[in-house]
Amino acid sequence: MSWLTEYVRPKIRTLLGRRDVPDNLWVQCPACQQMIFARDLEKNQRVCTHCDHHMRGTALERLKWTLDEGYTRIELPKAPQDPLRFRDSKRYTDRLRDAREKTHLDDAIVVAHGTIEGQKAVVAAMAFEFMGGSMGAAVGEGIVAAAQLAVLQKAPFIIFTASGGARMQEAAISLMQMPRTTIATRMVKEAGLPFIVVLTDPTTGGVTASFAMLGDIQIAEPKALIGFAGARVIEDTTREKLPEGFQRAEFLLEHGIVDMVVRRADMRATLSRVIALLTEGVTLPKVESVASLTEAKQPARTADA
C-alpha cells in the first residue's frame, strides 16, 4: 500500500467525517412524520410545511405571533404558593419549581397589551408547557387582571386557551377559578368590549366548562382538541361509539359550537377584522372604575303604604 492509502486517506475521512449535530435542528411532524428544519418550522409559526398540521405553540410564541411589535407584558398579581401543602408522588412546590425552571414562566398564563394590525387589544395566552396549562389560583389572577386591564384601556380582551383543566394540586381552590373567571369575562362584556376566545389544542376540563366557551366570538385552530371529558371516558360512561372527529375543531364548527376555524397564518388578520367589526362606531359606556362594573345593582325601594 502507498502512503496515500495508509496515511492521507484516513486523514481526509477524519476531516470530512460526520460532525456532531445538535438534537434540535430537526423536528418530526406528529401527523405526517416528515422531518422539518427547526428554523423553517419556527418561521412558519410551528405549522408543518408538508401537511399543514398545527403543532402546539408556547404562550410567549402566541404573543409574538399575534401582537404587533412593541407590545408590553404585564406583571401579574402573585397567588398563594401551595396553600394546601399538597403532595402526591412529588411535592407541589417541587413541581412548580421544575415547571418554572423549564419554561421561565411564573405560571400557566402570560398577559400583554398592544395592537393587532393597529387595533388595540389585551391578549392573554395560556401555557400548556407549564403543568399542562392547568388552571389554579395564579391563572385565575391572571385572567382577572387581564379583564380589568381591558376595561381600563377600553380594549378588546382576547385569550388563547390551552389547558388540561383545573389544577388538581389546588383542589377546591382551582375549582373556584371557574366562577371567578366567568365573572371577569362578564365584567368585560358589561363594559361594552368584545371578549374573543381562540381555542387551541388542547382545551379541556374546567377551562372549557368556564370562560373558554363564553366568548362573543369563538375561534378555533384547525384540528384542535376541544371538550370537557376525554372521548374514552365518554364512551365508557354512555356505552356509545362516538362519531369520527368528535371534539375536534371542525366537528364543533359543523355543530355550531365555534364560529370559525382559522389557520394560524391567518389569525392576526382575522382578529383585526373581528375587532374592527365589533368596535367601529360603537360608543362605550363611561367607566369610572372597574369596581363599578361588579357592584350588585340594588332594587329600587318603594315607599311604605
Curated annotation (Swiss-Prot):
GO terms for cellular component: acetate CoA-transferase complex. Its cofactor is Zn(2+). Its EC number is 2.1.3.15. PROSITE patterns: COA_CT_NTER (PS50980). Pathway: Lipid metabolism; malonyl-CoA biosynthesis; malonyl-CoA from acetyl-CoA: step 1/1. It comes from the Bacteria. Keywords: ATP-binding, Cytoplasm, Fatty acid biosynthesis, Fatty acid metabolism, Lipid biosynthesis, Lipid metabolism, Metal-binding, Nucleotide-binding, Transferase, Zinc, Zinc-finger. Its main location: cytoplasm. Transmembrane segments: none annotated. Zn(2+) binds at C29, C32, C48, C51. Binds 1 zinc ion per subunit. Residues 25-293 form the CoA carboxyltransferase N-terminal domain. PANTHER family: ACETYL-COENZYME A CARBOXYLASE CARBOXYL TRANSFERASE SUBUNIT BETA, CHLOROPLASTIC. Belongs to the AccD/PCCB family. Component of the acetyl coenzyme A carboxylase (ACC) complex. Biotin carboxylase (BC) catalyzes the carboxylation of biotin on its carrier protein (BCCP) and then the CO(2) group is transferred by the transcarboxylase to acetyl-CoA to form malonyl-CoA. This is Acetyl-coenzyme A carboxylase carboxyl transferase subunit beta.
